A protein has these predicted regions:
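N-terminal auxiliary segments of SAM/dcSAM-dependent transferases
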Residues: 1-29
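Short, well-ordered secondary-structure micro-motifs
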Residues: 2, 81, 106-108, 132-135, ...
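Conserved SAM-binding loop and adjacent beta-strand
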Residues: 6, 23-27, 41-54
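Short alpha-helical
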Residues: 7, 11, 31, 77, ...
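SAM cofactor-binding core of SAM-dependent methyltransferases
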Residues: 44-132
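Active-site segment flanking the S-adenosylmethionine/decSAM binding pocket
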Residues: 73, 119-186
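Active-site catalytic pocket residues across diverse enzymes, especially alpha/beta-hydrolases
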Residues: 85-86, 111-114, 138, 165-166, ...
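C-terminal substrate-binding/active-site "lid" region of AdoMet-derived donor-dependent transferases
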Residues: 154-278
Length: 278
């Protein structure tokens, strides 16, 4: 049985906009979230939820990012919850990257209803392509805080892309969801590896496909298709050091880039236009 994209997302939109007191909801992020919670009593949704959400909103209050990025927006729950938290922390921009155009449209409508249009911007398309555009356009040169909750094999490839572009540096914070269930062994292995271990792996050259080790076939193929590959072949930057903490039972891995070790031995962002792409 499908647990998403079976019409329930549009039903949510009709449920919320069909409320008799819709005027009282307008401009109030929490009331929009409350309505999503109410609808979830009858329908399962792949939202971050209240418990994991608090871990991230506490992180936002601590980091106080000027700009935050999320990979995987679904129907906008996280964009509303975290976008509001970013604004309250003094931030100015929240980018929500979503592959599915229908989900992105729903997110836009709910963000508008919540009164967060001034801070939340939804980008439709592949996350790797959108990250590249954010960097090359000059809109985001440095990742302050990034919430990762999209295509599971894309966690590590998108992180390596950000590393390659120079978007990750000391002070960057990553919050990756669902690393325990359904699980993401390749991502956990990477952010927990030493610089020496990553340098050794990098000698094999860039990865030309998604690393799906330990990821179920359903999870690996549900969103992107069996033969899908990353747009860019990248090694990343193995010289970056991460300090990681796994929040249990939430299954949310928070990784802090603490330092950079050694000279730059791999390609820099200036050579990006010469990098193999698909």
């Amino acid at each position: 049985m499908r647990q998403y994209d079976d019409g329930r997302e549009l039903q949510l939109l009709h449920f919320i906009y069909g409320q008799p007191n819709i005027e009282e909801v307008q401009g109030n992020p929490q009331k929009v979230l409350d309505l999503i919670h109410e609808f979830e009593k009858q329908h399962f949704f792949m939202n971050v939820g209240a418990e994991k959400g608090k871990v991230v909103t506490d992180l936002i209050a601590e980091v106080k990012p000027h700009t935050m990025i999320e990979l995987g927006g679904y129907v906008g729950y996280s964009a509303i919850l975290f976008g509001d938290a970013v604004r309250r922390a003094g931030g100015k921009r929240y980018f929500s990257l979503e592959l599915n155009p229908t989900f992105a449209a729903i997110t836009n409508l709910l963000v508008e209803l919540a009164g967060l249009r001034d801070i939340v911007r939804v980008l439709v398309g592949r996350s790797d392509s959108s990250l590249h555009k954010l960097y090359t356009s000059g809109e985001v040169k440095h990742v302050e805080l990034m919430f990762i909750d999209h295509y599971k094999p894309g966690y590590i490839s998108d992180l390596k892309l950000c590393e390659h572009l120079g978007m990750i540096s000391a002070g960057s914070v990553l919050a990756a969801d669902n690393v325990l269930y359904p699980g993401n062994p390749p991502y956990l292995e990477y952010v927990r590896s030493t610089v020496e271990q990553k340098r050794e792996t990098a000698k094999n050259g860039p990865t030309t496909g998604y690393d799906t080790r330990g990821i179920s076939d359903w999870t690996a193929h549900a969103f992107m298709g069996k033969d899908n590959k990353p747009v860019y072949d990248v090694i990343g930057n193995p010289n970056l050091v991460y300090e990681s903490k796994l929040n249990q039972p939430e299954g949310l891995q928070v990784s802090f880039c603490s330092s950079f070790c050694g000279p730059i031995l791999w390609r820099t962002a200036d050579s990006f236009d010469r990098m193999p792409s698909r």
